């Protein structure tokens, strides 16, 4: 299941209120820990008042790394590095162009989930924005040499959890940047060639990812190095496994550096 979100917003000159979205679960407000992690939105032409929401990270003052499945490249996107609401569209967001990997394909992914492949994109901002720091790209093959249960920091915007009771669980959404520690699940299968795997089931002080977190960085613990970008989860309750597209692959790095 994709981890981008379609949300309804109250928008006039500002973006302030949203409902029914999800992000880093079992986390805590990020504050200024990861100022280079931002939120990207795209207005949906045939759905007035609705936007698609994803997360991502600044690689430079005009390049924003995210997931290829997040947006339509035929329409403009907007990026903000503000950690939480209220958001003023005219001043907090910068317009940009969405550039998905040319080989991105839905339903073409390896392994049983088979969700997608080459799920990486770069937003080229129309004007430079310095959020106060930048994410760093990894060296080629870095993930392959990391041991099992390497610490990974996950960061993103969206729903922070669920309210459970009668009926369907209700999502808790604050439109705020959250972070949580997680652990790398190393495996040797067809998916590990392109994706890393993290638990999406919050426990023992660890966090997970969910809808709305797409494109957000999976950072090598305690660093600004992006190992992968969040791609999809295996169930609707975000309590299964999270798959993130590796950024340390030669062809992915060549694509990113070519934008």
Predicted regions, residues:
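Short loop/turn motifs at secondary-structure junctions and domain boundaries
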Residues: 45-49, 201-202, 207-211
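Chymotrypsin/trypsin-fold serine protease catalytic domain
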Residues: 117-206, 235, 240-242, 249-256
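Short, solvent-exposed aromatic-acidic interface loops
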Residues: 71, 100-104, 199-203, 230-235
């Amino acid at each position: 299941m994709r981890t981008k979100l379609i949300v309804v917003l109250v928008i006039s000159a500002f973006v302030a209120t949203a409902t029914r979205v999800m992000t880093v679960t079992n986390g805590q407000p990020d504050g200024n820990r990861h100022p280079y992690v931002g939120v990207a939105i795209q207005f949906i032409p045939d759905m007035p008042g609705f936007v698609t929401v994803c997360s991502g990270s600044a690689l430079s003052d005009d390049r924003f790394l995210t997931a290829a499945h997040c947006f339509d490249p035929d329409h403009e996107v907007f990026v903000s590095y503000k950690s939480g609401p209220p958001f003023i569209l005219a001043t907090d967001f910068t317009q940009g162009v969405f550039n998905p990997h040319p080989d991105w394909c839905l339903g073409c992914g390896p392994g049983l989930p088979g969700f997608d492949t080459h799920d990486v994109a770069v937003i080229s901002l129309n004007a430079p924005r310095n959020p106060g720091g930048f994410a760093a790209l990894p060296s080629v093959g870095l993930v392959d040499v990391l041991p099992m249960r390497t610490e990974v920091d996950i960061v993103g915007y969206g729903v922070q959890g669920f309210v459970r009771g009668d009926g369907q669980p209700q999502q808790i959404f604050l439109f705020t940047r959250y972070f949580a520690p997680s652990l790398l699940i190393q495996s040797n299968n067809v998916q590990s060639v392109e994706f890393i795997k993290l638990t999406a089931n919050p426990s023992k002080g660890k966090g997970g990812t969910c809808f709305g977190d797409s494109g957000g960085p999976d950072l090598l613990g305690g660093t600004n190095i992006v190992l992968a970008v969040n791609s999809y989860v295996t169930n609707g309750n975000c309590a299964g496994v999270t798959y993130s597209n590796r950024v340390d692959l030669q062809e992915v790095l060549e694509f990113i550096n070519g934008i």
